Amino acid sequence: MQENTTKIIGVCVADISTDYNDRFFEAFKRLAHEFHFKVLFFSAFSPLYWDQKHDIGEGNIYQLIDTDVLDGLIMLTITIKNELVRKSIIEHAKKRHIPVISIEYPLEGSLSIIYEYKSTMRKLLSHLINDHGYRRINFIAGQKDNLFSEERLQVYRDV
């Protein structure tokens, strides 16, 4: 009997119905086809932002992941707003020595892929100031305590 060598990658995401997630879903499906691996999506419908009964129950979906069949796990970490849920996903994967990749958010216990927003924000603001002469620029950074929002706000203050 021949052993199946097709790799299987799990993807954990929350708030399933967003455009942000749709772009990743399409990219993962395309890459799976191109590089001959399978992808399993695990998702909560809400962003798990509030620590209410509904979110707690929904967050448990990730504990049902059969890590015995996975070769790796990818988290679209910024979609999963609850830090305890994030940590539990990593702990669940670590029990089976499954590598975890966190996209767009540094997360202990994972390899993190982080986008670099600072230089782009600096270029944008410098362009508005130097090339267009703007001196009073109103700025809305995004969510409070969000790593990238805080970085953008700091660049705004620096420039």
Model feature map: region roles:
Residues 1-50, 56-159:
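Bacterial carbohydrate/catabolite-sensing allosteric modules
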